[in-house]
């Protein structure tokens, strides 16, 4: 989740079933505040898609971001997006 500061709620290797992952996602609560999308993307790049946390190098690295669509700092967000794209990450924004 993210607003002012991003927070990883769980890692890819924390759960072993689709049901457990769906339940973990359902338990995430909406958090009000700013939309520092750049900070969330930087966290994904540094920590989220890491083999130590369950990411596998032989599969596409996909991230889905659910946001209100208005980044607090569009310039920094574009910079983070370029870094992720340079590492061949696939991003979907909702």
Positions of the model-derived regions?
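Von Willebrand factor
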Residues: 5-61, 71-76, 91-94
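Anion (oxyanion) recognition and catalysis
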Residues: 85
């Amino acid at each position: 989740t993210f607003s002012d500061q991003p927070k990883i709620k769980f890692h890819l290797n924390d759960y072993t079933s689709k049901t457990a992952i769906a339940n973990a996602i359902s338990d995430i609560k909406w958090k009000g505040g700013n939309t520092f999308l750049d900070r969330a993307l930087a966290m994904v790049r540094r920590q989220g898609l890491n083999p130590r946390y369950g990411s596998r190098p032989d599969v596409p690295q996909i991230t889905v971001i659910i946001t209100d669509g208005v980044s607090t700092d569009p310039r920094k967000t574009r910079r983070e997006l370029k870094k992720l794209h340079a590492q061949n990450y696939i991003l979907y924004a909702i």
